[in-house]
UniProtKB/Swiss-Prot annotation:
Pathway: Cofactor biosynthesis; adenosylcobalamin biosynthesis. It comes from Hahella chejuensis (strain KCTC 2396). This is Cobyric acid synthase. Coiled coil: none annotated. GO terms for biological process: cobalamin biosynthetic process. Catalyzes amidations at positions B, D, E, and G on adenosylcobyrinic A,C-diamide. NH(2) groups are provided by glutamine, and one molecule of ATP is hydrogenolyzed for each amidation. One of its GO terms (molecular function) is catalytic activity. Belongs to the CobB/CobQ family. CobQ subfamily.
Amino acid sequence: MTNKTLMIQGTTSDAGKSTLVTAICRSLLRRGVKVAPFKPQNMALNSAVTVDGGEIGRAQAVQAQACGLQPHTDMNPVLLKPNTDIGAQVIIHGKARANMDAVAYHDYKRTAMQAVLESFQRLSSAYDAVLVEGAGSPAEINLRDRDIANMGFAEEVDCPVILVADIDRGGVFAHLVGTLALLSESEQRRVRGFVINRFRGDIALLEPGLRWLEEYTGKPVLGVLPYLNGLHLEAEDALPRDSIVKSDATLKVIAPALPRISNHTDFDPLRLHPQVDFQFIGPGQSPPPADLIILPGSKSVRNDLQWLRENGWEEVIRKHLRYGGRVIGICGGYQMLGRSIADPHGLEGVAGESVGLGWLDIATTLEPEKQLRRVEGRLWLDDARITGYEIHAGVTRCLASQTSAVCLEDGRLDGVVSDDNQVLGLYLHGLFESPQALTALLRWAGLNEVQRLDYDALREADINRLADVVDQYLNWEEIAGFLQVGPNSDDRESRA
């Protein structure tokens, strides 16, 4: 069995795989272990730009931070970005290869597995330990053939597996026992133990169930992790479910929950800011009065633009601007605010051209080569420093002289501001993570005395909080044994 590799699989989506990998990675780093995260295949519309100029799932970028590393395409060699109900853009080693439906991708999996193994071998050679995250559940019978995301990968590289389940949803013992029962005998042997996630209450009441589980399966419970309130690491793909109650929120910000929304993690700093009341507005919901409307990124811009119109957002924005409100469009939202969006190659569906909302004098054409950059620059507001990343296939040209939103360090200009200073559009994702930019943009939107928020520092604190929890509640002797690292090693300086 492969030394120094441990795979975390879950009984369901959102069982806690990403969070557990993040926590263990940081705990290992604090013990002086050189560790890297790895997810063979990810399906997500939230992605991050890597140091080598590709894109990976955002969860792996957070895990890289937990390891003290810059994100790299080897950490997530296969990324699937859904762009229709039956198809997705297939990204291999950070670069888009093709749009495929489910049948075509199934036939492509052998090629995808080669990319997975190449990346895994590079990480294994470079690091003391590799923490692997599975996808969804390993017990999806219809997905087992040619599986590269869960047990198919674990069997190929011969690594141990921990199975995690979410007790907060109920049925945790059925999830664990049922998942185990649907695995092959060799896969069952590969599962070394269980972790129960999001437990609330008195552990004494759970202990009879834990004893039964261990006796019934012959496998140990390696830890019961408590439910953590106020943990705000980026969600893998689903929009955040938990609202944040704030007593001092005075700025109302809303955004449409587009069917193909991408990189909704852009809004996390707004959700966490104590003075901002942020809300996603779904279909059938009436948008409330707001100070700021933000149009998010989209993996299918023309279709989401049509959805906006069908759900009355064009009139909502028109009225909002008439009463002095502000509007921001990010990436696909920026393109929607222009005069037209052309897709001559059919990159996001049927080839054609759509009339934009018309509040910015720009026109966009979608081109096959995707732009992937991590960037820094200065906002037109107060010369505020801004950092972010670009992930887009659109080439946008200005149809009239307009104020540029950002001057980038490489000399390029990004985005435009309307002549009346009410509408801003730009390609930069992550624009609210920079404290200076966040303060300047909130002030522009109408908030006078802005409290400073350092989103990266909050994320770092959350990662350390997770590591503290697994240090306390996981069986580290067993974990160290799986990874062939010393259970008691501890780099004290790395904690400082």
